[in-house]
Regions:
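N-terminal lobe/hinge region of extracytoplasmic solute-binding protein
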Residues: 45-98, 230
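Extracytoplasmic/peripheral linker and loop segments enriched in polar/acidic and small residues
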Residues: 323-325, 356, 360, 368, ...
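Extracellular/periplasmic solute-recognition and catalytic clefts
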Residues: 238-249, 265, 279-344, 369
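Long beta-strand-rich cores associated with HINT superfamily self-processing modules
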Residues: 557-583
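Short, well-ordered beta-strand elements
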Residues: 39-48, 102-105, 133-136, 190-191, ...
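Aromatic- and charge-enriched surface segment that lines or borders ligand/interaction sites
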Residues: 92-152, 191, 278, 287-290, ...
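Append "and occasionally in soluble cytosolic enzymes with long acidic Gly/Pro-rich linkers
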Residues: 249-250, 260, 349-446, 450, ...
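Gly/Pro-rich hinge or "lid" segments in bacterial periplasmic/extracellular proteins
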Residues: 79-80, 161-189, 193-277, 283-286, ...
Length: 583
């Protein structure tokens, strides 16, 4: 998925190339043959990913795929609303000490890694242990790996930040270095000691970043790890034709009861899926036509052009789709789309008046109209449904005259760059080449054109786009943050300086005052004080404008006629294990 901007932590270690080569050849052969998957098979369109290494699962597509193959200590409860956590590789929720600092997990005794030569020969396997969990969390902290998921642990686990600092040196990372906050008390007992009570810490342990990996397999593959090797999850990767198709099949020998959930009424008599197939398909219209032909069992991200064919005037499903047996579920999604300024950029990053001018040039009403009501206007970083969201308008909302005045204050009267005598020229990076992205980007360019700014549009594939963003090469870029869990700090951590690229603070905002507010909020146990801190952080970023707040998507999902036991979920990690197909 994400390119790794820093050297791999394993590139200086000898690697067991025979094992790595065998895995590569197996997947290549399977992908080339494109054998028919076992039925019933769930099929969907998805975006391409570069790796199944869960340490780099920072997109929804990569997270969904990694969650099929690997297990975490905890998982999101499929049924519960409001959302809550449930045990997964752990046999129960952790025991928590009275001071809230020690968490003790007991691993299930039936969590087994898939076969791999690294375990001692062809077909060899073994049980997952607490030591594997310790290794996996240390790996996430390794500075050489440069995982975008480090934020779930940063500043929280006793001794882990010191481990990360030591791993930044030129010598190979010592994974046997003691970390007081990570202890395998025996094969099945893991103790984590926090530096302070962290109300949101457990949510992070349900994300693919925190997947439990077998050390010997990771070290055998070295920099080639990421082909779905030796996971313990409900599916295994059977074939992968990069950029085209991924096929996952149910893991042999896994107890089906582990993945069973109370069934919805529509699931009576329906059969669990034996396989999951992801087909890479970037163009929205092609995805839609494929769904109508029955190629896919589910359709998401309905395009503007297809919206009127999906939703009737009263907001219900269009009658012709209902007649086909298609069903619709819809609700606001837990995500925020934003146009970011790279705060390291010498033009936009150093000039608050310029950023505010661009924010005032953004016409939210026209953006919502372009998207035919699929988008709700954004006034800050928190989406609807997240506690503490400021509902009032942004201090730099749409006002073209104010935008022009701010441009003059920024040193660009009339939009003219005094250094060139011509219009100020900026560049917006975009992570897709499809028609919908182009139309949206051209509309944004027209907003800036109105106030005198020339905006160039740079399109690339999503992996290429992320590489540029992670390397801080993009001046401005359009991106969506999908909440990892329903807590305001999950969105507000996108502005913490220690989370700068390649971490989730992709705009590289750095403010000591903001960092102090966030640190206090992360420790706060008094709800009123925490709410005040959440409000103060929103007020700061709304004023500083490291982002233009673009919108929040209304999640609309169409279910194929045979898909059963589906619940709309903001965190659908591994959800396919719960789904069924009707006869």
């Amino acid at each position: 998925m994400n390119a790794r901007p820093a050297p791999s932590p394993y590139e200086r270690r000898p690697r067991r190339l025979r094992a790595a080569g065998a895995a590569l050849l197996l997947l290549a052969a399977a992908g080339a043959g494109a054998a028919a998957p076992p039925e019933p098979c769930f099929r969907r369109a998805d975006r391409t990913i570069a790796s199944l290494d869960p340490a780099f699962a920072s997109t929804m597509a990569a997270g969904r795929a990694a969650a099929l193959v690997y297990e975490t200590l905890l998982q999101f409860d499929y049924e519960a609303r409001p959302y809550r956590l449930a045990p997964y590789a752990a046999e129960a929720m952790p025991e928590v000490s009275e001071d809230g600092l020690e968490l003790t997990f007991r691993l299930r005794d039936d969590v087994r890694f898939g076969p791999d030569e690294a375990f001692g020969g062809p077909g060899a396997t073994r049980r997952a242990t607490a030591a594997d969990a310790v290794f996996s969390l240390k790996r996430l902290a390794d500075a050489k790996l440069s995982s975008p998921g480090w934020w779930i642990l940063a500043g929280k686990v006793e001794g882990l930040d010191a481990f990360r600092e030591a791993s930044a040196g030129p010598e190979p990372t010592d994974y046997d270095r003691d970390v007081p906050g990570l202890r395998a008390l025996d094969d099945r007992t893991l103790r984590i000691r926090l530096v302070r009570p962290c109300p949101d810490f457990l949510w992070g342990l349900a994300l693919p970043y925190a997947s439990i990996l077998p050390r010997e397999v990771v070290e055998a593959r070295g920099e080639d790890f990421g082909l779905g090797e030796a996971g313990s999850g409900p599916f295994r990767l059977a074939s992968w034709r990069r950029g085209h198709r991924m096929l996952f099949v149910r893991r042999e020998g896994r107890d089906p009861a582990r993945d069973r959930t109370p069934e919805l009424p529509d699931a009576v008599g329906a059969e669990p899926y034996r396989a999951v197939e992801y087909l890479a398909m970037g163009d929205a219209s092609t995805r839609w036509l494929s769904f109508l032909r029955g190629t896919f069992d589910l359709a998401t991200e309905i395009s503007r052009d297809d919206w009127d064919a999906v939703v009737a005037a009263d907001g219900s499903l269009a009658p012709d789709l209902a007649a086909r047996g298609v069903r619709m579920v819809a609700e606001p999604s837990l995500e925020t789309t934003y146009m970011a300024f790279n705060m390291d950029d010498p033009v936009v990053g150093t000039n608050a008046a310029l950023r505010r001018a661009i924010s005032c040039a953004f016409d939210s009403a026209q953006w919502v109209a372009l998207n035919r009501g699929r988008i709700l206007p954004a006034t800050g970083p928190l989406p609807p449904g997240v506690d503490g969201r400021i509902e009032g308008p942004s201090p730099w909302s749409f006002d073209p005259e104010r935008a022009r005045a701010l441009l003059a204050e920024a040193g660009y009267p009339g939009g003219i760059d005094p250094a060139t005598g011509r219009r100020l020229a900026l560049t917006l990076d975009l992570g897709s080449t499809d028609q919908e992205m182009r139309e949206g980007a051209e509309l944004i360019a027209s907003f800036l054109d109105r106030v005198g700014i020339s905006l160039s549009l740079s399109y690339s594939t999503f992996p290429q786009f992320l590489r540029r963003v992670n390397r801080r090469e993009a001046q401005m870029f359009l991106l969506t943050w999908v909440g990892d869990y329903p807590d305001p700090l999950n969105f507000l951590q996108l502005f913490v300086s220690s989370n700068a690229s390649p971490g989730p603070n992709r705009c590289n905002y750095a403010s000591p005052s903001y960092d102090a507010l966030f640190e206090e909020a992360a420790r706060a146990t008094d709800p009123a004080r925490r709410a005040a801190l959440v409000r103060a952080m929103q007020e700061e970023v709304r004023d500083a404008c490291p982002w233009v707040f673009v919108g929040h998507r209304r999640e609309v999902v169409l279910l194929g006629p045979r898909l059963r036991n589906y619940r709309l979920h903001d965190f659908p990690l591994g959800a396919e294990k719960h789904w069924r197909r009707a006869p």
